[in-house]
């Protein structure tokens, strides 16, 4: 009799737990830099993008309300891991979004895998997320170091820049960005003549720029991001480097231009998968975003990636019927084609890489610009299958043998 009662109690407890899970909100955690060098590039803007996606989807998935949380990882992997564990263990978070700073993204991806939830990296850059460190619980949405490094190195080489000096952020993202650009450079017959590593949030690039200047390289490649891009390009102009050497920022975004000005940044090449002024759909969404943004800025590609990633995630949650099993949700995301107003049609590969076209853009001159945020012109389109690393070259364990 006691054993029967115990079994019934266990069944009742399991049923109660299942009911509670079914009634609890689907929670989206946006984790990024809210207070340092990447805050203007993801920060509150990525949180807004996630909220807009939830609103546009209708506010519910699998019959459950959808909520958005956010946290500042301070660009520290240990802080990111602590936040992720608290979110997943105590706060009922089902998916973690954005993750600029690849070292943080690696740490969070591992926690998410252990807890069988979902991570969608939009701000994260390292292509290792879909390479040796791929996971059945992780999707890499917007860009990666392979796409930026290879595309820009090829474009610059075609314009005559054959000898390079790298100024590289000294963490996983910077190292990988330099490696990918170097790979394309060497394949195209170019040469690396030197390089230096810089800490994140560097305020004085003078010693690094002097080393680049004395190297005699035709191209000074900045493998840094966020506020470090703005600071290094400003100081390069002050040192007069652009008069004798080409300054190439391997990750140069729309948010860098206001701080530099069009006069200082005109002619700079960059690669984006999204630009607000591409078509009527991107313009309409971007204007809505700008009206609500804390800094009244137009969205960048990584913030757009948060929006699109949340939409596709919620579709998968509806398809699966819940958010509890992260692997099942990611499998559904891969099985369904992607389609949204910002990136258009695409798909998610077996290794977790989201595929879409990339665009080679150039910063306009002051005379070409028609006003605020009219900063770029599209030079060419890179088809999706060429924009990202071939599947069989990534060494992702999920696709071993392919």
Regions flagged by a language model, labelled:
Residues 73, 120, 127, 200-201, ...:
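Venus flytrap/periplasmic-binding-protein-like
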Residues 82, 127-128, 135-239, 276-284:
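Extracellular/periplasmic Venus flytrap/periplasmic-binding protein
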Residues 25, 40-46, 56, 60-132, ...:
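Beta-alpha junction/loop-to-helix N-cap segments that form part of ligand/metal-binding clefts
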Residues 235-308, 318-320, 324, 367, ...:
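Extracellular/periplasmic periplasmic-binding protein-like sensory domains
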Residues 14-19:
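N-terminal signal peptide c-region/cleavage motif recognized by signal peptidases
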Residues 29-51, 71-78, 100-101, 167-175, ...:
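Extracytoplasmic "Venus flytrap"
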């Amino acid at each position: 009799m006691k054993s029967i009662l115990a079994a019934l109690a266990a069944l009742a407890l399991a049923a109660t737990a299942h009911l509670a899970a079914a009634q609890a909100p689907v929670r989206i955690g946006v984790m990024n830099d809210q207070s340092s060098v990447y805050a203007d590039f993801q920060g509150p803007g990525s949180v807004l993008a996630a909220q807009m996606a939830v609103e546009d989807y209708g506010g519910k998935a699998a019959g459950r309300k959808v909520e958005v949380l956010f946290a500042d990882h301070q660009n520290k992997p240990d802080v990111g891991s602590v936040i992720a564990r608290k979110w997943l263990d105590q706060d009922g978070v089902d998916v973690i979004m954005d993750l600029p700073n690849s070292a943080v993204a690696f740490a969070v991806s591992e926690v998410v895998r252990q807890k069988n939830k979902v991570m969608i990296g939009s701000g994260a850059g390292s292509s290792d997320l879909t390479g040796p460190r791929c996971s059945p619980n992780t999707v890499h949405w917007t860009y990666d170091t392979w796409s930026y490094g290879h595309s820009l190195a090829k474009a610059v080489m075609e314009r005559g820049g054959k000898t390079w000096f790298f100024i590289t952020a000294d963490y996983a993202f910077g190292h990988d960005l330099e490696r990918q650009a170097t790979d394309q450079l060497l394949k195209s017959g170019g040469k690396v003549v030197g390089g230096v590593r810089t800490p994140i949030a560097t305020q004085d690039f003078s010693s690094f720029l002097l080393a680049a200047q004395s190297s005699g390289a035709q191209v000074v490649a900045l493998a840094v991001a966020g506020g470090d891009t703005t600071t290094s390009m400003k100081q390069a102009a002050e040192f007069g480097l652009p008069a004798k050497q080409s300054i190439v920022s391997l990750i140069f975004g729309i948010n860098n231009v206001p701080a530099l000005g069009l006069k200082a940044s005109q002619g700079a090449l960059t690669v984006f998968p999204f630009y607000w002024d591409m078509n009527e759909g991107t313009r309409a969404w971007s204007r809505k975003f700008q009206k609500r943004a804390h800094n009244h800025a137009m969205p960048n590609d990584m913030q757009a990636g948060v929006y699109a990633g949340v939409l596709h995630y919620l579709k998968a949650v509806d398809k699966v019927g819940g958010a509890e099993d992260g692997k099942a949700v990611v499998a559904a995301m891969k099985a369904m084609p992607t389609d949204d107003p910002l990136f258009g049609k695409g798909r998610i590969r077996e290794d977790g890489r989201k595929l879409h076209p990339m665009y080679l853009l150039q910063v306009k001159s002051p005379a070409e610009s028609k006003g605020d945020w009219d900063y770029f012109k599209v030079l060419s389109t890179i088809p999706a299958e060429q924009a990202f690393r071939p599947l069989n070259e990534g060494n992702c364990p999920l696709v071993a043998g392919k």
